[in-house]
Regions:
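Catalytic cores of enzymes
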Residues: 1-246
């Protein structure tokens, strides 16, 4: 990896009315990274990206950290066409499963929730949807890490699964680390920190994830709900080369 964009510790209080209407208003649930349990702060996502940032810098990897008010949809869109080899997003994620005949619309119903600094702008409402991601040029990005709930979910259509993973693959990303269910905020931070420790020690993405999951099981998070949701898509393949600039 040569450069990374890291999003976490996002300021959800800035989000638009549109976003607030989508997620629940029940703030008494546990700290899971989806909209189902309320639109609450995720304090460990800030720890997570700070840990990742420090680990990558140790390896002299150039990082851009987007936290608080700066973790907006507009900032993510600005990665369009940039040669960023790693993108990490720690936030709320969710999806609405549609019927198979509605699969063409499913990409509009799988999303990540970003900070709402530009919520008044039509195209930057705080919801980063799969259909929007699919229009970007993220070729050359070796891996996207989606540290949020349900980021590997979607609607099954005739041409496969329609969700965030399809959005990022259409954008040209090679490997995706995603989740198949809700994930715990603190456990996710621990897993991701260990995952990157393993990466910088020389392990492959797949080996790094297996070791990180094992670490959780052996350190107070034996229940599969804490570590099993995380899976890799297309790990170990070569990235699509980013077009050279003339």
């Amino acid at each position: 990896y040569s450069s990374a964009a890291l999003f976490g510790g996002l300021d959800y209080e800035m989000a638009s009315t549109k976003v607030r209407n989508i997620v629940s208003t029940d703030h008494n649930s546990g700290k899971f990274r989806n909209g189902q349990n309320g639109y609450h702060e995720l304090p460990y996502t800030l720890n997570e990206v700070n840990n990742v940032n420090s680990l990558l810098k140790e390896k002299k990897i150039k990082t851009n950290l987007f936290v608080g008010e700066n973790g907006t949809e507009k900032q993510f869109r600005a990665l369009d066409g940039k040669a960023v080899s790693l993108i990490h997003i720690a936030t709320h994620g969710d999806y609405k499963e549609l019927k198979q005949r509605e699969a063409d619309d499913a990409m509009k119903h799988c999303f990540l929730i970003m900070s709402g600094a530009n919520a008044t702008e039509e195209n930057n409402d705080g919801l980063l949807r799969a259909d929007e991601i699919s229009t970007l040029n993220l070729r050359g990005c070796r891996m996207v890490v989606l540290s949020a709930c349900n980021t590997g979910q979607g609607t099954l259509g005739a041409d496969g699964l329609f969700g965030l993973q399809r959005g990022f693959k259409n954008a040209g990303v090679q490997t995706i680390l995603m989740t198949l269910s809700a994930v715990d905020d603190q456990a996710s931070m621990l897993l991701m920190t260990k995952f990157y420790e393993n990466i910088i020690s020389g392990l492959s993405e797949r080996q790094a994830l297996i070791k990180a999951q094992q670490y959780l099981r052996e350190n107070g998070y034996a229940d599969s709900k804490y570590w099993a949701p995380f899976i890799l898509l297309d790990a170990g393949k070569s990235p699509i080369p980013h077009p050279s600039k003339s």
